[in-house]
A protein has these predicted regions:
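Glycine- and acidic-residue-biased ligand/ion/polar-headgroup-sensing regions
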Residues: 58-60, 64-72, 79, 87-92
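His/acidic/aromatic-lined binding-pocket segments of jelly-roll/cupin-type domains
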Residues: 60-64, 102-103, 110-111
Length: 141
């Protein structure tokens, strides 16, 4: 992945400020709306053994691990093949990929994923499911 220049990405900076300045411990899971078109999904789940890759066209994802650990598979969208076609309303498509890397994520880690970054989140680091609380911030492109 290429380095990002945050001073040229004001919406990403804004999303990071939201993450830094919000205590999510007392907020229930669900969708959170912000005035500038940024929104977030606060979720709690158990990791899984495998999943399809996904990609988005309208939003950048910032995936922030609030508690727990998981790994996220990441690869270039152009190397994937379509599995489930793009749903414009949900801004998601599901893909298959053969050449990818896993990034291990632990409490306090975040990962910025651009539309060119296909990803499969919520994967167990070892073979057993792990309890995770995660915030996925959606930043309009």
């Amino acid at each position: 992945m290429k380095n990002i220049v945050l001073d040229k990405s004001p919406r990403i900076l804004e999303a990071i400020e939201i993450i830094k300045n919000t205590n999510f411990n007392d907020i229930p899971d669900g969708r959170l709306e912000y005035p500038t078109g940024i929104w977030a999904n606060l979720q709690t789940y158990y990791t899984k053994e495998d999943a399809l890759f996904e990609a988005h066209r309208k939003y950048i994802d910032i995936q922030f691990i609030l508690a727990g650990q998981e790994k996220i598979g990441v690869c270039d969208f152009s190397t994937c093949t379509e599995n489930i076609p793009y749903d414009e309303e949900k801004d998601i498509e599901f893909l298959d990929a053969k050449n990818f890397e896993y990034i291990e994520m632990k409490t306090g880690d975040f990962l910025i994923l651009y539309p060119k970054d296909a990803h499969k989140p919520s994967i167990s680091i070892d073979e057993s499911p792990t309890h995770v609380r995660k915030l996925v911030v959606k930043v309009p492109v």
